[in-house]
Amino acid sequence: MISHLFQTYGRRTVEFVKGNGTKVIDNNGKQYLDFTSGIGVCNLGHCHPTVMKAVQEQLNDIWHISNLFTNSLQEEVASLLTENIALDYVFFCNSGAEANEAALKLARKHTGKSLVVTCEQSFHGRTFGTMSATGQNKVKEGFGPLLPSFLHTPFNDIKALKEVMNEEVAAVMVEVVQGEGGVIPADLSFLKEIETLCKKFGSLFIIDEVQTGIGRTGTLFAYEQMGIDPHIVTTAKALGNGIPVGAMIGRKELGTSFTAGSHGSTFGGNYVAMAAAKEVLQVSKRLSFLKEVQEKGEYVLQKLQEELQHVECIQNIRGKGLMVGIECTHEVASFIEQLEKEGLLVLQAGPNVIRLLPPLIVTNEELEQAVYMIKKVVCTKNVSII
């Protein structure tokens, strides 16, 4: 069949037609354990019953009107997002790139400065602003010239950061765990130093929680575990559990810099997205739920260490909560292909890291099942090494 799609994705040939919880079924009836969650989107699993009910009920009332009118659902979701954290205002959009774009615009508008510092191997989006912020050349090839006034320093390198910080820096944007960059957690000392330097030079501290947010690491936002106080936090992906929605969350003091007409979104905060986000947050914010995520994260890391520590091609196992990276000594594309054949869907994070992003509702039994499937594949000698 001739495709009329731009070939912007390296698609696998399998096509899925049904999903439920942690499982998906392809068009041949084969069932898979999904440890991708749509790249960290379906944190509550596929077709979560109460999220589905909330969306279905909203579809019977009103889908979309305009942000020129009052929307009480937006207020409810904003309250859920800012509850128990030192952030006050929310701007709703449709994706992580849009949330980060809003953060960059707000930082420049509020500070009156233009220079933004991010990290090498970071990923912040594919719009011109967020692509310029991203610290990976492969994302930018062929699209230049990019926006000026973006600097990239090595992740977790305090010395390099200090060398570029000055009064001209509007903001520092960083991920608590670099997802696309290899599932690499930020050092606490690095995040603390960013906070200190931002205070010193009057810069905004922006945390990108597009992939780590909404419970992925065992707290609603990963930064909450680090004892830091950012000016802005961005989130998306799991906020709608598959319904497109993103959010930029900022301190009250930034509110006067985004006035009527200064920024906006046609679809951002629409009723259907807000219905999904409200239910997602009501489920994800439960302390018992978050505690289970922490426990499952510890459990799967322990099981992976036990089963893979003596496997020659395994170089490192790391992660935070249910965001796990298995670093290998060589490229992992063949492993991922073989795991798919075995019935386990996983992701890459760079050329040599297997990334696991299971739904947060995953059971210990399913985690064990995945670990043994991974062990089987990485220990199979006839798996080709690219």
Swiss-Prot record:
Keywords: Amino-acid biosynthesis, Aminotransferase, Arginine biosynthesis, Cytoplasm, Pyridoxal phosphate, Transferase. It catalyses: N(2)-acetyl-L-ornithine + 2-oxoglutarate = N-acetyl-L-glutamate 5-semialdehyde + L-glutamate. The modification N6-(pyridoxal phosphate)lysine is found at residue 237. Binds 1 pyridoxal phosphate per subunit. N(2)-acetyl-L-ornithine binds at residues 126, 265. InterPro entries: AcOrn/SuccOrn_fam, Aminotrans_3, Aminotrans_3_PPA_site, Class-III_PLP-dep_AT, PyrdxlP-dep_Trfase, PyrdxlP-dep_Trfase_major, PyrdxlP-dep_Trfase_small. The keyword Phosphoprotein does not apply. One of its GO terms (molecular function) is N2-acetyl-L-ornithine:2-oxoglutarate 5-aminotransferase activity. It is found in: Cytoplasm. GO terms for biological process: L-arginine biosynthetic process. SUPFAM superfamilies: PLP-dependent transferases. Pathway: Amino-acid biosynthesis; L-arginine biosynthesis; N(2)-acetyl-L-ornithine from L-glutamate: step 4/4. Pyridoxal 5'-phosphate binds at residues 96-97, 123, 208-211, 266. GO terms for cellular component: cytoplasm. It is an enzyme of class 2 (transferase). Its EC number is 2.6.1.11. It comes from the Bacteria. Its cofactor is pyridoxal 5'-phosphate. May also have succinyldiaminopimelate aminotransferase activity, thus carrying out the corresponding step in lysine biosynthesis. Belongs to the class-III pyridoxal-phosphate-dependent aminotransferase family. ArgD subfamily. Homodimer. This is Acetylornithine aminotransferase. It comes from Bacillus anthracis.
